[in-house]
Amino acid sequence: ACGKDRWRGELDDHSAHISKLSDGKLWEFRNQSRNRLVDFIRERFERQAIVSGLPSEVVEIADQVLDPDTLTLGFARRFVPYKRPDLLLYDPERLVRILTNSEHPLQLVLAGKAPPFDEAGKGLIQKWAQFIQQHNLYRHVLFLSDYDMLLTENLVQGVDVWLNTPRRPWEASGTSGMKVLVNGGLNLSELDGWWAEAFTPEVGWALGDGQEHGDDPALDAAEAIALY
C-alpha cells in the first residue's frame, strides 16, 4: 500500500477509487498482506533458529510457525524500559491462555533491538525469549532478533493490529503505527505520541487515560489488565 509512484501527484482520484471498493475486496487485501507476512516470517525465523542454535525440533517447525488466517498483532521497536515491551508479560499464564485459545485464535510477532550498553533493554528481550521457550509457543508468538528495514516494512504491511505501550509522555511520535494505518491495519496504543491526537474508535483502541503517571507499578498493572 505504501509504494512510491502511486502517492505522487494529486490524491483525489485515489479516494474516489478506494471508496468504491467493497468490504469483501478490502478484507481480501488484508488477508493477502497477512499471508505474505507469514511467509516472510517463516523464512526469516528458520535462519534465525539455525544461527541461534535453537533445538532441532524448533528448526523443523520453522516453516509452520504462525497461521496466515489468524489475527496477527505486531510489536516492533527499540527495547527500552519506557516503551514497556514486557507489559503483556504482566500475567504470563493469562497471556498463554489468550494465545492458545482455539475458539478465538490470536498470534503475536515481536521484533526489536536493545541499545548496545543497555542491560535493562537486553533483559526485556530475554524475558520474551524465555517466555516463548518455556511455554513452547513458537507457533503462536515469535521474537525476531534481526530487526532491520525489510522486517519493519513487512510488519507494517501485514499485521492486523499494531501494539504500542510506551509510558506517557515519552513517545515522541510512533511513526510505525501511522504506516500500519495506511496499510489497512488497526492500532492498539497508549494515548501518547501521534495516537494521542489521531485516535478514533474507527481505526483502533486507546490504552490508558491520557494522563502522565511516571514510573508507577500500579498503573502498569492496571494497563496490562486492560490490554488483556
Residue spans of the language-model regions?
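Catalytic cores of carbohydrate-active enzymes across secretory and cytosolic contexts
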Residues: A1-Y228
